């Protein structure tokens, strides 16, 4: 039977796995029938115990082991990345501090004599910073013992599997980088400067032991080596050491200055060594009148009488003065002695040495005039080689970082030049060229040459959705139509919004053209006009501002249960009055969002759409105007009818009077003169009656015509269907 250990099984310690037979307790594994379960026979004095197989002897429970695994750091995590940056900084600090130990020794000039001394105050300051840097090296070792690594056998696919076993991590680290890190963290300069050198000087009084500091700086090699794998780890995790191009250029310049700092410090120490060598050579030549002792070169012997007597008669210091005509050649170290660099305060001599290193690295050591000394010649050769290599690296890296700053600007310049050449080749008119130039310039100012769509599409869907929500949600909420929607619908909208840029005078859509997108204004102004008012000469124009939208015909089309393939025609002409930034929803995306709108069981969104739709506003204004005109027509018709009724009454009364007068005229026909006089008076009254009758008929005819004529009305916009399909 094959036994498989499950991660959920809790293994107990030996004190719980063993049972005493004398007490007749039930064995823990009594029900186990595996053949490897054996009973061990113990001596009589001891009680019989049940032997537990080796696989069950775990002192740590699985859940405790998971806790230990949680303490292991991920090499690609933020914590390790931040620590690598901090440790890189302190590595650079340590590399700058170590050469400062060379400046502890100096030459003190007292009249005609000189001596060598040590700057204790400077030594304390340098030791403090060096010790502080050493603590970070020790902490780095501790962190590397707790940092997981990727198994080489699991790199077939993806990142690979992290090994989080502390024992395996420690074993791998001890076999690889532990020795280098251990050597780098040892406080060797402090030990040599404060313990070894003072004891040697007190016993032998030989200041040439400063060369021991050069031997100690062998530790500088592993410290310098640690910079490169550390930078490689940061580049592997983030792609670059620094986040900005200027910081990267400064980082490379800092490395070049570090090399100049090391060169200047070594030149200073070798100058001190060269001065001491000359003193010893001249000291060995003197025998009378007083014996020269190398102890006299130490400033600690200034109080001794024999030293004072010796300095009054010796020629050692005059024979080692480079300004005199002497046989000893100082070579490239003569400037440090003639200009009293070795006797100057710390700041002055440090800056001069830094300038010496920077000058000779940049000129590849061409200004160095060496002597025949082997050490001096080798030093000059190293200066020339390192100067050539480091200067080439500096120029290359600086050029790379600085070009990365202007690469997009250069691409934009090339694109603009190609655009100008194309417009000239195609003989475009000047107005079109100006529009193209304005658009290219405005797009550069808005995006700085960054293709946002490509960046977003390269990200995972969930991350892309969160970014779009962060960028667009607050702006989308400014649109009153979207302010009525829930977060889920807004997420769907933000995910499909695309930025749109329009320059002044650009036509977004023309009246009668198919509507391909719905535009939501974020910045700028648009002019929306239409001539479709149902009658000749109709014109309506409005200004769209931030928060408004256009292309609502597309929303009505998308909300149809069975929308056609043909896109709706625009009822308005939309033109940019200034530079406009907006979000656009394409027809397909709007169709998807519109299907989500059907979940809204409220008329509130429909009323909001009507209120903020400029097409509906125009229709409502025309509707009010038509209603007002209809009211005016009715009022006019009523007044005309009233006037007609009065005119008809006057006409009937005039006809009756005329008939009465005519009858009286026939009854009195016997009197000829009187009858003729009466007939002449009746004819004018009868003519007036006929004219009044005709006027009344014309008035009635005009009223009927006005009543029959209807003023054309603007057609009502399509009603968006916000209901839910059953």
From Swiss-Prot:
Membrane spanning stretches: 87-107, 123-143, 178-198, 212-232, 253-273, 378-398
Keywords: Calmodulin-binding, cAMP, cAMP-binding, Cell membrane, cGMP, cGMP-binding, Ion channel, Ion transport, Ligand-gated ion channel, Membrane, Nucleotide-binding, Transmembrane, Transmembrane helix, Transport
CDD domains on file: CAP_ED (cd00038)
Boundaries of every IQ domain copy: 617-646
Topological domains annotated Extracellular: 108-122, 199-211, 274-377
GO cellular component annotations of the record: plasma membrane
Region of interest called Calmodulin-binding, as start-end residue ranges on this chain: 597-612
Ranges for region Disordered: 707-726
Family the UniProt entry places it in: Belongs to the cyclic nucleotide-gated cation channel (TC 1.A.1.5) family.
Assembly information from the UniProt record: Homotetramer or heterotetramer.
Role this protein plays: Probable cyclic nucleotide-gated ion channel.
Domain notes: The binding of calmodulin to the C-terminus might interfere with cyclic nucleotide binding and thus channel activation.
Alphabetical list of PANTHER family matching this protein: CYCLIC NUCLEOTIDE-GATED ION CHANNEL 14-RELATED, CYCLIC NUCLEOTIDE-GATED ION CHANNEL 15-RELATED-RELATED
Protein name as it appears in the record: Probable cyclic nucleotide-gated ion channel 14
